[in-house]
């Protein structure tokens, strides 16, 4: 049989053309607010990283020029150096006390590339009640989605910050410096709380101590890249490891994907063959993609798997302890592998350490080995991650340690996982 062939019609396709330049009237309002603010804060997120390294440099120039404090979400770590004097540390559910308190009490919040997610805001009706809020984001759907803002600026972070800086300089680089000095004095009082302090042990390795030693022994490496899995170890890594540049911290934030870190570290190592690439992991997350050790061995990738092994699903166990009356379910394992033997079976190097006195030597052995390493660090099984904003509570109500947890979480918060 024969017939006429009729080709498919060309389907119409939509195009995404993001707006790069921000509205000049809104930028003017932001500059005016910067000039007048008495208690400002820069609240930064992953959008700064995504905008490119130029955005981070412009941000640093703006922070230095204004002397405003700066905090960051989990995904924005590295956009401003952790060694910088204006750095307050990460904010949010497991963020630092001084960062969360400054966010709550500020009179000007400048959101740059963050999304006001629930781990940052706490209870929305109590979120930073007295502040004027500006929000710079390339995605218009993120503006006013969760928190109403007073100064919305849609555009690419680098383009907008460049315009903000140029306008602020042209107007005389003014700030309310006397008021900002008082603001820094208040922040100093919050810093004196020392919210990351913990009770160390000479018998068992505390996970915080393990990461402090890892930081001390690796922070001089400019080519250090850190990946993580998801859980308590991820939060401790964000608290105790410092990042000086963007794109040196790879983690699964909003999605919270257990199993992400190991394949991510392989990708980073392939992209940077000579770099030091460390995946900070929990044993449960790491086992979700353990088969990738075969990839690391096959391609001779010197990735370091730094497992904080508490034999628990630590974050799940912590929530069950604090929110659900210690009714534990499916948050531990009695059938974990011997990770040293597992590494050997793959043809990698395995190291196990359980004594705090041996930790530094074990870390140095891991760092000096030119090949993939599975580092099994046996840590305190029931250590909780603090500070912590309880679910259903405002972001200025934080648990700072075990002594603050009793009756801290109501029944309404217990359902907000």
Question: Where are these predicted regions, by residue range?
Answer:
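A short, gly/pro- and small-residue-rich
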Residues: 57-66, 121-140, 246, 387-403
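Thiamine diphosphate
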Residues: 56, 100, 105, 144-146, ...
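Glycine-rich phosphate/diphosphate-binding loops that line cofactor/substrate pockets in enzymes
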Residues: 26-42, 62, 103-105, 213-221, ...
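Conformationally flexible catalytic loops at phosphate/diphosphate-handling active centers
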Residues: 1-34, 195-196, 400
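Glycine-rich, acidic loop regions that bind phosphate or pyrophosphate groups
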Residues: 76-183, 363
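Active-site diphosphate/adenylate-binding microenvironment
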Residues: 186-263, 268
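Short internal beta-strands
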Residues: 67-74, 134-137, 303-309
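Gly-rich Lys/Arg/Thr-decorated short loops/hinges at beta-loop-alpha junctions or inter-strand turns
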Residues: 2-15, 81-82, 186-198, 247-248, ...
